[in-house]
Amino acid sequence: MSEQLLKCREFVLKEKMISLTDKGEIFNANNELIGTFRGKLIKIGNTYRIRDLNETPVLTVAEKIISLRSSYRFYKGGEKDDSQYLGILKRKLVAIKPSYWFEDPNENHVFGMKGNIFTLKFKILKEGNVVAEISKKLWKSILRGHYGVKMNPDLDDDSAMLILGIVLMLHHEKEENR
């Protein structure tokens, strides 16, 4: 069942509006439910998990709480295990417009983000090329908490899940900075 989630490259993310935890559903372009995401009840140092329809965790993202800048550590699967560590999403310390990037475990810059975090309209770049676009307009959504993610169809499954996690954390950042 996670195959549906892993192979998808066009997503619609729908956040549950009335929820004590950050949670929502992940749909494909045909509006078929293919996964879920959710955080914890206590928001400090939150941990988010993307799960397939069998509730199997595909990706875990842990918010780093003792840090000068916002940062999130990404792990494959459901545990915060060093052997499954994929990298970290960081935010530039001082910037008029928030600036984010993703580094692998060796601190190599893998993805950069360009756009407006406050409207959730931005592009994710890898080696200078656009590999994903995030926008409410992609899905003609006027509902708060609904947005589309369109990825390059040639992206590998691991990169696609990383980008999905990055998008969820950018949404979390946007909500935290309201």
Annotate each PLM feature.
Residues 1-178:
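Intrinsically disordered, low-complexity proline/glycine-rich segments
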